[in-house]
Amino acid sequence: MPRLIAFLTALVLSIATPLTAFAQQNTIFSSENPPETTEEFVEVAVQGLVGTTTERRNAVDLLVAEGKSMIPTLVLMLNISGNHVNVAKGLKQLTGETLKDWRAAMLYQEAHPEIIPHPSYRGLKLRYFTSIDPRFMQFFPPQYSSRDKMKIRFEEIAWGGVRVDGIPSLDNPKLLPAAKAEYLRDDDLVFGVSINGDARAYPLRIMGWHEMFNEVIGGVPVALAYCTLCGSGILFETQVEGRDEPLVFGSSGFLYRSNKLMFDRATNSLWNQFTGEPVSGPLVDEGIKLKIRPVAITSWKAWREANPETQVLSLETGHYRDYGSGVVYREYFASPDLMFPTIVRDESRIKRKDYVFGIREFGAAKAWPLKAFEKERIINDRVGQTDVVLIGDPLTRTVRAYERGGRTFSMEKGVLVSDGKRWAVTEDALKGPKNKTLARVPGHIAYWFAWDGYLGVESALYDG
């Protein structure tokens, strides 16, 4: 935890650094000289950040006088300046609550979607973002970033501590045959992908630093979008109907409710990593939802033995990182705490950073706690009206799901059986007697808070 706290402290300091980039206008606003235009209200907020003690106090008073529409502005000011006493007092006046820091203020804001930001909010926030990285503007052109054009609340978009592509994607990275991957330990976890017989392994110790690969596997263009904060690596098909070329994704540097916002390089639309849908930009009204493909987290040893012809990601990524086992995000993964604020709706049965395996297919969604597989490796269940069987190993965070066609499966002496007949477990399907096959069902691992935050209202939770 001490290293996590140190990291968070450094992050807060880095967030506060752009304060020096806010140049104040010559005009000093007060009750005797109040702001009148949207642009002047932006300058009032700047005055509240960089003015003298009296000027800052006067600025907050002017913002508070405008009413609750200024709550998002004060929350942003708290983010930029740290726990500024005048801003905190202003928030208490408007909310009636003591919001001790930016995290608490963001949770309040998330819980109150009825609060519409003042028209000056956009200008202040873009000024803040561009002081960090001018390239951030490519995601928020005026014609696509108004409130009615976005699928998420602009006031809830938070800077994640890096610039555009500060977490670099791996695009068609160098691969090795399994026999040459001497850097890997048997117990290293990998994302295992197999499409049309083309098996690949992507170690989490590397992917944690990059959070995205764009590849063609088995002739299918795909991207693995890995949100380390959510514990979720989701494999998406990237060829979208109506587009000539597959989409290529990168990391924007932004978060929404502790989930990464990725972007496509063709249109600079922002996408929700968890849902595979555009939330801002030219593609937002195109009705696009990326198709999810199966992916399994498992140990390198288990993947290699099941897929001896597999290729695996090389350490030669073109980037310098510490790719050692268990290095990346070590403190965060070990902590029960979230790094960025978001409301956790329900922890009555499962804690926020407990792992679940989730499926959203067949017109329904359902999640299974990973710890459910401690009792039984095989779970016969259903998603919506479709029967499924899940095969799991909580020690390696591994779950694979398949349709079961009304059959009931069990594990006997390490062999999958139904009605006394053996079935082989492959990456594509279960294979049984008389060449019968049962298709693999796409799903993925995630922290509970992320699954519940994005799908909890419409999703069922296994309680067996």
Give residue spans per PLM region.
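Positively charged n-region of N-terminal signal peptides that target proteins for export
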Residues: 1-4
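Bacterial N-terminal signal peptides
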Residues: 6-20
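Structural detector for internal amphipathic alpha-helices that build alpha-solenoid repeat scaffolds
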Residues: 25-36, 54-66, 73-77, 85-97
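Mid-to-C-terminal functional-domain signal that highlights helix-capping/loop sites
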Residues: 27-28, 75-77, 96-464
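Stable alpha-helical elements in mature extracytoplasmic
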Residues: 41, 55, 70, 83, ...
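Buried hydrophobic core positions in alpha-solenoid tandem helical repeats
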Residues: 41-46, 71-77, 105
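Second-shell loop/turn segments in exported
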Residues: 47-49, 58-61, 213, 288-289
